[in-house]
Amino acid sequence: MRVISSSLILSSLLFASIASAAPNGKAGPVWRAAEKMRPAQLELLEQLVNIDSGTGDVAGGQKVSLIVADRLRALGMTVELLKAEAPNLPDNVVATLKGTGKGRLLLIAHTDTVFGPGTVAKRPYRTDATRAYGPGVSDEKGGVVEGIFAIQLLRDRGFRDFAEISFLVETSEERGSPGTRALIDRLVRQADVELNLEPGDAPDVMTVWRKGSTAFKIDVKGRPAHAGVAPQEGRNAALELIHQIQLADSLPKTGDGLTANVTLMSAGARYNIIPEDASATINVRLREKQQGDVVDAFLQKNAGITLIPDTKVIVSHEAS
């Protein structure tokens, strides 16, 4: 993440009237106020980054949620810690702030990362002249910090020309938000505008849309047999899975943002047994929901084309 006063950028996006208070850009009072916040921003960023909070790390994730909740509560927001909708996940934070005007704004950020336990010990937070480094510094603990300080900037300037600001800080985004899907749907329906605090493209570009993601799982059922005594009696699920993956790789390349890539594979239980079970997960990125239907139909068709006799292929859609 770039070490800049992102609070100014976000605040200007939230309410255009604040931007009008800074007609000279970086010379304006809002920019100067945001610049003064930089040390405090980086201090909070360091605190959050130096806590391991990979998705499913309940202890670390809960520590981060509590820190965020306390910071938002200190800004005068009404804060709730809500249990995740899926097991083995930390609490989500929902904070609201009432204003005196019109317009309901929803901010969404997440505190879980893709990094495993012990990552912080290996490469903790650090900075150089222009950047901050560490697990989750950009995706997306930096966004959480931006949201907190944007709200603080509005509060410090006495800006209340909005009906309500809601801030959801969730804890399972990196796995498709299984802990907040219903919550996100409810909050989005209550808002007039939603801003996602994921990092955009450099330099300082606001991203107005992103591709969606989903996953398909291919499960193959074969027949186990001893690999030395009677391999001919077996039906190798691993070989059929390889066949299905090769078929999947021939998915038509449409050129409109649809991609499908095998990301997980597993097969077998013991080294001397012909695998009875094998599975693979295909990560799909798409621009339109209908593209997922194209992939589903393609994989289901392939499931009926087996190379290894007596194996069964099941394709399931892991919606996200």
Label the model's feature ranges.
Residues 1-6, 162:
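Positively charged n-region of N-terminal signal peptides that target proteins for export
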Residues 7-17:
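Bacterial N-terminal signal peptides
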Residues 22-26, 43, 53-54, 63, ...:
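Metal-dependent amide/peptide-bond hydrolase catalytic core
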Residues 22-135, 153-162:
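Acidic/His- and Gly-rich active-site-bordering loop/insert found
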Residues 47, 149-156, 243-249:
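Short glycine/serine- and small hydrophobic-enriched flexible loop segments
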Residues 131-145, 226:
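Glycine/serine-rich anion-binding loops at beta->alpha junctions
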Residues 140-213:
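Acidic/histidine-rich catalytic neighborhood of metal-dependent amide-processing enzymes
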